[in-house]
Amino acid sequence: MTDANLGIEQTKQLAASLFNRTWELIDKAERTEAEELEMIHSAHASRLHWQSVGGPQRWAIGEWQCARVYCEVGFPESAIFHAQACLEIVETNELPVWMHASVFEVLARSYWAAEDLDLAKLARGRALQLIPKIEDEAERNTIADQVAQLTF
């Protein structure tokens, strides 16, 4: 649902801006409690706006970002919930292979945050199997770098 006063392009711009703001906060080395709360809200707001103007790929990316945020702030149950929502979207739509690798990366990260190393290793292994199949070098490198952060 979007604000009735916003058009499609404005809603897309708002969703993208919120997504980018969330990334700024994720990348910040030290965050205040207020910034962590902002990070949660901006990820959810971005996901909400993409629901009305995006498609399955945008929805999956939004769920992926929500899961990543919850890993960052130490709420593994919420991270797993959003990672599984991402997986559902990816598996029920014809999305590129990098999306499949990405969802397994965030599942691994979420299970790691929950201290379930068996499931974390399983998900990381699946991501590692998919990375060589990603055709675009930049996408392949981005996901490989994210998986490399999983040092359990």
Label each region the model flagged.
Residues D3-A4, W23-E24, A43-Q51, Q84-T92, ...:
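Amphipathic alpha-helical segments of tetratricopeptide repeats
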Residues N20, Q65, M99, V106, ...:
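"A position-specific structural signal for the A-helix of alpha-solenoid helical repeats
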